[in-house]
Each structure stands twice: as structure tokens, then as C-alpha cells.
A protein has these predicted regions:
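Structured soluble/peripheral alpha/beta segments that form catalytic or ligand/cofactor-binding pockets
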Residues: 1-288
Length: 288
């Protein structure tokens, strides 16, 4: 970005702000890789600002960031070689998020911090769209299963409710860290109970977006106009880096005000290291 934040074009990718915090346009024109996209995002509701997240490794601050998440619809097209996907706002609802602050991007610190410890990070992040509302919740747990960060919001046309007492019940696929079912519950500001059941259908690998990618990680400069893409067989599911981090497309069943509704969203999963409630004791051991 040449040290200019208003220059939102990087190589073949350009992001245009049509209306701040409401409408964005994403253009991708990469004739060398035969990848093109023209997508417009329009927010359904106001963005939700998540609480500030500060994480430390001993005295070192490893993360000090804030994120906003917004639900909305997508419209446009994506083409790759001889295939084209038409995206219509009536069929394609989803979310977008943006964070700012200190995050572990670029090359890692060459100075290790003794004593060396097993890395630990338990992250669940779950935005969802329903016909007349949206919801968003997330967890960060320590190794004992205590939430160090959590947040939950439900948005309606005329109402935004920040929930409290967020709880979870997680079922894993045997021998793995993949989630087969997730149940969440929380209390609205009026004291009424809300619950979700998430049923994962399929997933994508976040290394395709640069997370934990061995060569094209976030903040790695490859040249002015360099680009690449990876191809993954989603029927295969390796459980080693960089494939630990996924977003699972889920059916959401929400029970709110004694009414049940179904929606669609994602459950982002990054589960590394010990987590007592799950029975995880080592870096990458699976469910018993």
C-alpha cells in the first residue's frame, strides 16, 4: 500500500468504499492467473465492534487489536479459468470483518522467550444471518477452558442486544479437533434465555487467505504485483499446520423469545494446544 492507507489497491486486488460502513466493492483482475471478481457488499445492519483483545506471552504483548464485524449481502460475479459464479444479493448473505491494532503478521520474532511452552489458542468465532435478524458470538479460552475473551450480539431492524453469560457445549469428531456440533446459550438484557445449535456442513481452509500459510503469510512482501493461488481437495482433511485453521459453513438453529428460526453462518475454528474441557493435553492431540 506504499505507506498510504487511502490507497486500497494491492496488485490485482482493489477495495472501494462506496458508502462508509455500509457498502464496499471488491475488484480482482488477474489475467496471468485467470482470476477475476467484481463483488459488492451491502450491510444489513450497523457494524458490531467487538471488545478490545489483548493477549500476552509473559511480558510480551502478542496481540492488541479491535475488530468490527458486519452482516450483509453480496452481489456480482467470480470467475476462475472457465468457471463463473453469479452472486445475487437475494441468495448470498454473509459477513465481513476488519481489525486494527497489533497482530502477529510478517516474519516471526527470531528471539524465543524462555521457558519454552506449548502454544495454546482456543478460538471460536460464529457470525450468522437469519431472515429478519443476525447474530454473532465468539470465544477465546485458556488451557483450563476459562474464557479470556467472549462476546455475543443479536441484531434486529430496530434493536441491538448485547448478551451476557455466554456458554458453550462442544462435540468433536472422534480422534480430531474438528467440531461435529456446537451448542451456545446466553442471556439477553431482559433476562430471557437464547440458544443456538450449529451443525457444520463443509469447511474451507483459512491458509487460503494467508493464515499460517508457509509461503504467503500475512504481511509478507513478495513484490509489487506478485500473486498465487492454492488448490485444496476439501474431501481430505489434514490436521497439521497450515490446515488447523478453518471456517465451517453451518446450519444455525436459533431459539429466541420462544421462537425457533434457521439461518446460515460460519464457525471459525482454531484449536491449538491444551484445553481441559475438551480433553486436549498436547499440541495437536484429538478428541478421545
Amino acid at each position: 500500500m506504499n505507506q498510504e492507507r487511502l490507497d486500497t489497491k494491492v496488485g490485482s486486488l482493489k477495495v472501494q468504499v462506496i458508502e462508509p460502513l455500509k457498502e464496499l466493492r471488491i475488484d480482482v483482475i488477474d489475467p496471468d492467473k485467470d482470476v477475476n471478481a467484481d463483488l459488492t457488499f451491502v450491510g444489513r445492519f450497523e457494524p458490531m465492534q467487538e471488545p478490545r483483545m489483548v493477549m500476552k506471552n509473559g511480558p510480551r504483548t502478542t496481540m492488541d487489536s479491535t475488530r468490527m464485524t458486519q452482516h450483509g449481502s453480496w452481489n456480482g460475479s467470480i470467475s476462475f479459468k472457465d468457471k463463473e459464479i453469479k452472486v445475487s444479493k437475494n441468495e448470498y448473505k454473509g459477513s465481513r470483518d476488519r481489525s486494527w491494532g497489533i497482530r502477529p503478521v510478517g516474519l516471526p520474532d527470531s528471539q524465543l522467550l524462555p521457558p519454552l511452552q506449548i502454544p495454546q489458542f482456543y478460538w471460536l468465532w460464529a457470525p450468522a444471518n437469519f431472515e429478519d435478524s443476525t447474530s454473532h458470538l465468539y470465544f477465546v479460552d485458556d488451557s483450563l477452558g476459562n474464557p479470556t475473551h467472549s462476546h455475543c450480539v443479536i441484531q434486529h431492524e430496530e434493536e441491538v442486544d448485547v448478551l451476557s453469560d455466554l456458554r458453550k457445549e462442544i462435540t468433536y469428531k472422534k480422534g480430531s479437533r474438528r467440531i461435529s456440533e456446537a451448542k451456545f446459550s446466553a442471556k439477553k438484557s431482559n433476562g430471557s434465555e437464547v440458544s443456538w445449535i450449529l451443525e457444520p456442513k463443509y469447511h474451507i481452509y483459512m491458509c487460503g487467505l494467508g493464515y499460517m500459510h508457509p509461503e504467503w503469510g500475512h504481511g509478507h512482501f513478495k513484490g509489487e504485483n506478485q500473486s498465487t493461488y492454492d488448490s485444496y481437495d476439501l474431501n481430505e482433511d489434514p490436521h497439521d499446520p497450515p490446515f488447523l485453521h478453518i471456517q465451517a459453513i453451518c446450519k444455525f438453529t436459533l431459539n429466541e423469545d420462544n421462537k425457533t428460526k434457521e439461518g446460515l453462518g460460519v464457525l471459525e475454528e482454531l484449536l491449538i494446544g491444551p484445553h481441559s474441557p475438551s480433553g486436549f493435553e498436547e499440541l495437536l492431540d484429538g478428541s478421545k
